[in-house]
Amino acid sequence: MSQIILDEQLGASELVVPLQKWFKVRRLKDILPHQTILDDRIPQILLSLSSPTFLTIDRDFWDRRLCNPGYGILYFAIPDFRQEELAISLKKLLRLRRFRSKVARAGKVIRVSATKIEFWEFQKNRLHRMPWKRPGRQPSE
């Protein structure tokens, strides 16, 4: 079962329960309780886990330098108040052959917006783009 790690700003009530139907879901603060986890520590934490996929809405993670074969990063370009849309969008995204397995996501930093998916891959210099329609209302971006 794929392991999804939720960034700290993601609400547990909006995501953990719906996502647990399909994935093993953990929050960063549950992995390292009683610690403040700054963004620059997150890649090392992810490398200590078994091929996790890190889910975030923090734009700082849309950075090709974070590509590593030990994990994948999914950055959804949505505002904080739209977190309730993430579970359905994530499920739809992970049905795509290109992102279906943890092996397929490993080494990628993926940005999902209302109209497209973009991603960088480990040791590749090309930004990949593909069309996408996020479920639900479409924000103006």
What is each PLM-predicted segment?
Residues 6-49:
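N-terminal first-folded block
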